[in-house]
């Protein structure tokens, strides 16, 4: 290997392959075309998207399953098109590598007035913009340092679980660099243990555990980002305390455990308020992920487990590897001293469904979402789009080893359709390498509203082109129902154009009888829903399966109905003035 060389582009792509990227998303453009010539020779699969925004969303979805994803765009127009997706990945800690093909070094150095710029010779503006949504950036300009710079940036992506940007000029693509660097893998350096801080933190946490009377556990979404999942689940099983997740954390805990009660919502407010200790793993306290901070416990009754620190009350113990700390905490628990919390919580699996007539129209208030739990199975990847689906999926009881994406903080509507494309590709890549729960035909299931679907519908064509196995439940409630609940329930700005949604698959190239099938269903009544959920072609088939569910425009999950009712009260009060 000594003395051997390879093009810089292949060094970058082979590094991504080593880190677990098998498929790379993007859109070709004149500054990245020669770069893309090296994708397949490097061992990667190219997935071309309809636009850069969707490519970024897809890379984000891929990264949440495979722990890293990558997207390629062209300089300026392409990268700015993708920046919304990159910002969302930054906000919700998805490790995405954004690779940007840029003009030749000579053009940049001479400040040439060329296309995709502001025509003023300033090539640094886009670098500055990207600094706000990435944790590390580099523009490769020197073949001697380029490999080490690539390694440095990729390490930052892994270390912080957030996006990075690598810009590669056209004339740097073929530059030869040593192969030798690929012989050593990029790995997060092991944290140096801090024995005194560990002991102090363990003693502080154990003291709070043993002295509590009414404890609970909350698992939040940043648990996913830093390799804590297995240890957190073991801790929950060992201690046996009532456990909830945030919306962002749903799918990260085994919901079949008897002490796991699903997503903590305002319905559990009285219980949460009564607790004198809340252990929070991977906290992410945005207003939308915490029901306007209801889930954020007061300092005096909380222990927060963050990636590099433990906070007990107001005391913060820093530089502690949280995964190792949780393992030590579990081992040192004295079961005889752990308090039991007597409560009247009912496990979701024991809750009864409302009685409905088969001929009645389906409604979200009639237990619509709860009826999907028997349909779900081990290995499913489930996505609930911002809007009514994002709240509805809270009601699912997930089987073990199931993943669920739902809105947390960024809430860019339309994200989930391209994210389903990315997640399904990650699922396929894992199946191909026999790393996916020994399953050969797993499913990606998307729940999305009509308004969100219209935002990014083009990627349905990519799902079809890539022959992915995706199930889509499209909630047709005639517009932006979540916005109607917030404000303007009868305003035209919350309407969307009526589409023939079930014709979309045919328009985008699928057919009913070919190798890659697209199957469609329509649901209006409870009998329709029961029939569709028991259809083996939907549950066990392959290809694209799409179900259009018709609902009233002001039908929404409970939490949104509360907002709608408040809006009506305000309108009535205003009318009396």
UniProtKB/Swiss-Prot annotation:
Q: What class of enzyme is it?
A: lyase
UniProt keyword terms in alphabetical order: Decarboxylase, Lyase, Magnesium, Metal-binding, Thiamine pyrophosphate
Name its co-factor(s). Answer: a metal cation; thiamine diphosphate
In terms of SUPFAM superfamilies, this protein maps to: DHS-like NAD/FAD-binding domain (SSF52467), Thiamin diphosphate-binding fold (THDP-binding) (SSF52518)
State the residue spans of region: Thiamine pyrophosphate binding.
388-482
- Report the GO terms under cellular component: cytosol; nucleus
Question: Which CDD domains does its entry note?
Answer: TPP_PDC_IPDC (cd02005), TPP_PYR_PDC_IPDC_like (cd07038)
InterPro entries associated with the record: DHS-like_NAD/FAD-binding_dom (IPR029035), PDC/IPDC-like (IPR012110), THDP-binding (IPR029061), Thiamin_PyroP_enz_cen_dom (IPR012000), Thiamin_PyroP_enz_TPP-bd_dom (IPR012001), TPP_enzyme_TPP-bd (IPR011766), TPP_PDC_IPDC (IPR047214), TPP_PYR_PDC_IPDC-like (IPR047213)
Comment on bound cofactor: Binds 1 metal ion per subunit. Binds 1 thiamine pyrophosphate per subunit.
Q: For this protein, what reaction is catalysed?
A: a 2-oxocarboxylate + H(+) = an aldehyde + CO2
One Gene Ontology molecular-function label: magnesium ion binding
The UniProt record gives the binding positions of substrate as 30, 116, 483
Q: What is its EC number?
A: 4.1.1.1
Per the record, the domain of life is: Eukaryota
GO BP annotations of the record are: aromatic amino acid family catabolic process to alcohol via Ehrlich pathway
- The UniProt annotation places Mg(2+) binding at 450, 477, 479
Q: Which family does it belong to?
A: Belongs to the TPP enzyme family.
Q: How would you summarize the oligomeric state and partners of this protein?
A: Homotetramer.
Q: What is this protein called?
A: Pyruvate decarboxylase
This protein's species is Aspergillus parasiticus
Q: What is the lineage of its organism?
A: Eukaryota, Fungi, Dikarya, Ascomycota, Pezizomycotina
């Amino acid at each position: 290997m000594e003395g051997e060389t390879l093009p810089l582009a292949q060094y970058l792509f082979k590094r991504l392959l080593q880190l677990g990227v098998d498929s790379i998303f993007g859109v070709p453009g004149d500054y990245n075309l020669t770069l893309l010539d090296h994708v397949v020779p490097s061992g990667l699969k190219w997935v071309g998207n309809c636009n850069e925004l969707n490519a970024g969303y897809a890379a984000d979805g891929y990264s949440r399953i495979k722990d890293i994803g990558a997207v390629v765009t062209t300089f300026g127009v392409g990268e700015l098109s993708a920046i919304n997706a990159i910002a969302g990945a930054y906000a919700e800690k998805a490790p995405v590598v954004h690779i940007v093909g840029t003009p030749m070094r000579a053009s940049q150095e001479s400040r040439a007035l060329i296309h995709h710029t502001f025509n003023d010779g300033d090539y640094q503006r886009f670098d500055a913009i990207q600094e706000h949504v990435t944790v590390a950036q580099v523009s490769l300009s020197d073949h001697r340092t380029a490999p080490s710079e690539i390694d440095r940036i990729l390490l930052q992506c892994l270390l912080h679980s957030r996006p990075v940007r690598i810009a590669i000029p056209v004339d740097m693509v073929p530059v030869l660099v040593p192969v030798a660097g690929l012989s050593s893998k990029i790995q997060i350096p092991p944290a140096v243990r801090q024995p005194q801080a560990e002991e102090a933190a363990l003693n502080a946490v154990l003291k709070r555990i043993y002295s509590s009377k009414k404890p609970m556990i909350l698992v939040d979404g940043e648990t996913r980002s830093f390799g804590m999942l297995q240890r957190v689940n073991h801790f929950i099983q060992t201690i046996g305390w009532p456990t909830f997740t945030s919306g962002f954390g749903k799918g990260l805990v085994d919901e079949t455990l008897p002490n796991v009660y699903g997503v903590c919502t305002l319905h559990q407010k009285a219980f949460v308020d009564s607790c004198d200790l809340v252990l929070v793993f991977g906290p992410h306290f945005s207003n939308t992920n915490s029901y306007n901070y209801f889930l954020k416990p007061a300092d005096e009754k909380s222990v927060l487990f963050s990636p590099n620190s433990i906070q007990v009350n107001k005391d913060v113990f820093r530089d502690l590897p949280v995964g190792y700390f949780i393992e030590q905490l579990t081992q040192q628990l004295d079961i005889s001293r752990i308090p039991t919390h007597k409560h009247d919580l009912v496990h979701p699996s024991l809750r009864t469904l409302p009685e409905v007539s088969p001929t009645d129209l389906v409604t979200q208030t009639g237990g619509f979402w709860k009826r999907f739990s028997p349909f779900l199975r081990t290995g499913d990847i489930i996505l609930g789009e911002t809007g009514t689906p994002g709240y509805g999926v809270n009601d699912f009881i997930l089987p073990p080893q199931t993943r669920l994406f739902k809105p947390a903080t960024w809430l860019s509507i339309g994200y989930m359709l391209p994210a389903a494309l990315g997640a399904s590709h990650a699922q396929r890549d894992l199946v191909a390498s026999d790393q996916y729960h020994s399953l050969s035909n797993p499913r990606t299931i998307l729940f999305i509203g009509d308004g969100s679907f219209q935002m990014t519908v083009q990627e349905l064509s990519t799902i079809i082109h890539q022959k992915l196995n995706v199930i889509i439940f499209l909630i047709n409630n005639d517009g932006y129902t979540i916005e109607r609940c917030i404000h303007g329930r009868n305003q035209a700005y919350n309407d969307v154009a009526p589409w023939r949604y079930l014709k979309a698959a045919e328009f985008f190239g699928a057919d009913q009888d070919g190798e890659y099938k697209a199957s469609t269903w329509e649901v209006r009544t409870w009998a329709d829903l029961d029939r569709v959920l028991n259809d083996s072609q939907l549950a066990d088939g392959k290809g694209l399966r799409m179900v259009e569910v018709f609902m009233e425009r002001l039908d929404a999950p409970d939490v949104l109905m509360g907002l709608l009712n408040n809006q009506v009260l305000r309108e009535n009060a205003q009318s009396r003035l």
